[in-house]
Amino acid sequence: MIKIGSALLVDQGSGLVRTGWLKALAEDIAQLRAEGREVLIVSSGAIAVGRRSLHLEPGRMRLDEKQAAAAAGQIELAHAYRTVMADHAINVAQLLLTLDDSENRRRYLNARNCLETLLRLGVIPVINENDTVTTQEIRFGDNDRLAARVAQMACADALILLSDIDGLYTADPHRDPEARFIPTVTALTPEIAAMAGAALTPHGTGGMVTKLLAARICMDAGCAMAIAPGKDDHALRLLRQGGRQTWFLPAEEPRTARKAWISGALKAEGTLWVDDGAARALAAGSSLLPPGVRTVEGDFQRGAAVRVVGLDGSPLAKGLIAYPSDEARLLVGHRSGDIEALLGYRGREELIHRDDLVLDSRFRHRDEDGEGHRS
């Protein structure tokens, strides 16, 4: 899978598609296809292209104007991709996805089935966020994480983020002359996260922050990811010839498709704060039971994705909760045997069953290093 940023695809001055660059990319993709590889593309650029055709001022667009620009730009981008790929007898298809399409299990599976069918028919899917219907609260916010979610959805072997940077450094190389290049990452440790220059929260923004968040989704799903320079023509060819790039290698034991979907969920609807005993039980593979929960935050329904954090706020896990928020609050601190008396019906013993629970990779590494929670 290849992710193409707006700055690579669209000339920032004129607002036109960089046709020569796109033709060179199409040649590289045609070569990959000739070698028997399936290719998917996640493409930005619709708003930038549409803004020009609608004569809208950059930096001053309202939400409705951005949505209009996206609608106009999608047609131009689709035409550009179809034109350059037709030179190689390759069909393309456009998929517009929203955050909810990846968070809702049924819609996620429907989108995955569509991708699989297109690939079986020899078509290259070109995917973008559906900016015409999304708002700031219900969007990916960047195509790095969209690309990672789709790579997970399509069971891709690798995701290549073509960018204006050539990989990960220990610090910003433009500001720190002693910054060292990192060619390979095998685990997203706190040290690696610190290199992004900001916290890796689900709502994190900024170039390297979103790329590391995308890497976490990919690695947990068993998909390798690369950050590679893409400004020059034939970026993929240069990459294969040994050009500089940072590879994030997947976990040795990738999660099941269901757990990878839970782990990759970007929108947690609530937070459960748990004590040290519960944290140790989670690390040992147990379900989350009511006695170990101290606080329930948020308003959510049964089956919602929630975060599980320690008393110090450190991330422990993400899971699908078995009770709505009002009932979960009633169960806090109580034994599982008290559930029927508290709720008036006999519910599940656990708030989150271990089959619906995924440990945070940072918590797993802390536990393996002997730095887990202690009483």
Curated annotation (Swiss-Prot):
E.C. no: 2.7.2.11
Domain of life of the native organism: Bacteria
Catalytic activity: L-glutamate + ATP = L-glutamyl 5-phosphate + ADP
GO biological processes: L-proline biosynthetic process
One GO CC term, this protein: cytosol
Record GO terms (molecular function): ATP binding; glutamate 5-kinase activity; RNA binding
Subcellular location: Cytoplasm
Binding site for ATP: K3, S163, D164, T205, G206, G207, M208, V209, T210, K211
This protein's UniProt keywords: Amino-acid biosynthesis, ATP-binding, Cytoplasm, Kinase, Nucleotide-binding, Proline biosynthesis, Transferase
Pathway: Amino-acid biosynthesis; L-proline biosynthesis; L-glutamate 5-semialdehyde from L-glutamate: step 1/2
Residue sites binding substrate per the record: S44, D131, N143
Top-level enzyme category: transferase
The PUA domain, residue ranges: 269-346
Pfam families in the record: AA_kinase (PF00696), PUA (PF01472)
Physiological role: Catalyzes the transfer of a phosphate group to glutamate to form L-glutamate 5-phosphate.
Family in the record: Belongs to the glutamate 5-kinase family.
Protein name stated in the entry: Glutamate 5-kinase
Gene assigned in the entry: proB
